[in-house]
Amino acid sequence: SADRLEYTLGNAHLVFHCPEAELRAICGDLFVGKNEENIDELCFAHAEIADIFTRLSLRQSEWFVSDDDRFSMQALADLLREAQQRGVLTLDDLYLDEPHVIGLLLSDPVIAARWQDYRRITGTQSGTQKPKNTYAVKIAAKKRSIDPLVQTSDGLRRFTSVSADYAAKLAAFRADDFDRWVWAKYE
């Protein structure tokens, strides 16, 4: 869909610093075709350009559901929930600017210690066993991925049927069930 294309290209440019020439090549290669259900869909005219796009999109998909991303969001949510339960902040406070919210977190010694601990996180570790005396979580996530249509000599086909390499990488990404404990790593 157009919105998925927009955020994929936007992130490719802003987060992953994709060269402008590659982004232009991707946009210039698109056309509207009919998918398997005879519905209009954006398609690629050339497999080489679809390959550039799918590498970018899969990299983003993996990044957005990485252990680091899932853990940091869950740990922050749990920290804010605890702050709310302790009366340190309200839901309305979350609509204020970050310095105000951080000031509230620092006003309570228990929450301030948790906040300072959160700020020291440099990554994550994971395993099948939950470590003792350690904040660890199992976190599922919705996976988004793209298998675009590409023009071939046989007509329009999904890129996974054209590129065995992409098909394998996409299958591996989709197979991850997040059935592991994740906890913070500190330097």
Question: What function would you assign to each model-found segment?
Answer:
Residues 1-187:
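Histidine-centered, transition-metal-coordinating active-site segments
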